[in-house]
Amino acid sequence: MAESCNKKHPVLAVVGPTATGKTALGVALAEAFEGEVISADSMQIYKGLDVGTAKVASEETHGIPHHAVDILEPDEPFSVADFVALAGTLEADISARGRLPILVGGTGLYVQSFLYGVRFAAEKTPDGLREQLSAEMAEKGPEAMYKELQVADPEAAAAIHPNNQVRVLRALEHFRATGKRLSEQKAQSLPPERPYRSLVLGLDFPDRAQLYRRIDLRVDKMLDAGLLDEAKLVYDHRQTYRTAAQAIGYKEFFPYFEGTAPLDACTEKLKQASRNYAKRQLTWFRHMDGVVWLDASAPDVTARAVQLTREFLAKG
């Protein structure tokens, strides 16, 4: 068994809620250990959605390659199965070149599915089911469809925001197509042994008020950087940019564009939605096995992360 473990590639992950400094720490660790970053963010995969997804600026990368960023158009679908396949290819290439793959992001389902080696069976959606569900969504509304999901698959519903119509429909589609809950599929698709030797570093602020202040400040900075123009682009293409149109950072401004709410109210709504999202991220990562939590407010947080990574790599 020890020999098998030694053959596994080491993979580092930096996780945690939004606005905790994951990007900067990922870059620092990549500089210290000849690493390359794989973005584990479900929205940074899309081109043109830069401000609202808090993509790393070129000057902030310090020359470190960042993968799984800006590779799809906003109207192209991208699933967790797609991410696991893409990240697997990227990891193999990075490791083959003698560099350290560093997963950085806050999409917990992506991180966990990749590190745990979840296998996704190809399932055929019955003809007309997707169209039927979309029609039901239009007729009954998001709240009714979410309540249906809560009955059919409570665990999936708990992990999906009620306003995320795309994911609600996907979960219902899976249930109606297979008669099984997503959680059942996940349990059946876990391999007996994880494919990578991993260290998962989690960033959080012990003072929740400090995290919320950082989130509010980040929203203000995003607005200064052109978030409203980006949100208007998504609004204008909302029929085709369906995933982006459900994303936090864009949909909150739709009432402003429709003339039904002032900008200040929409901005406050975004701040509240971001705070709620941070809570859900924390809940997800707190339930993941083996996360080593670091105080993001500590002056020596980077030094501590470097030390832990050095010890982790030495064990390989």
Predicted regions, residues:
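Phosphate/pyrophosphate-binding catalytic cores of soluble transferases and nucleic-acid-acting enzymes
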Residues: 1-316
